[in-house]
Amino acid sequence: WPVGAMAEILLPATAHAEWSLVGAALALVLGKQSHQRAVLVSPPWQVFTPFAEYSGIAARQLCCIHPAQKPGRVADADSVWVSEQALKCRDVCAVLAWLPHAQSQALRRLQLLAAQQRQLLWVFRPEQARGQSSPAPLRLCLKVLDKTLQVRVIKRRGPPLERVIELPLLNQRLQDELLAQADRKAQSRQDAEALLESLKAGRLLSSMEVPS
């Protein structure tokens, strides 16, 4: 991932594949700088703590900000402003911003700030923005197919890359943990049902006892 430059990620609204793509890099950066934070601006979902932790990211290092859209303001203007302030903060090592309606001028400001501050900056936008011009040196388009994340590089420094890159949607460690959690929940449900049946049977026997 380019440090000091914007990486623009284009993806369908229902993909929710951001973490699968950038999680490993974010874990590496935060692991080396335990006092630093990553700022998530206007994420469309709530951070799933086990997902983060099993990606190697401490939840305390993630700061989620949802700026309110003020009446009369240009769409995403407040989210852009928060992203700018985060890029300027020396306690922040990475900014992840969801800016579906950001204008080109705002994106240019973010790209310039990322370069000045030597920060990691990921900007997530809808795939419909692919036809728009962008100051990002790196632009990727994502698609989710079954358990695979397909990544197409549509802009980068150097020669173009025609082939599609395929990545696992979830890392194996996280898949194992989610399956284990599901098994534990299923077992707990079975144990609870067995206990309930036992209690019902006990009450039935008590009601059938004949007083001496």
Located regions from the model:
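N-terminal regions of ATP-driven nucleic-acid and macromolecular assemblies
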Residues: 1-212
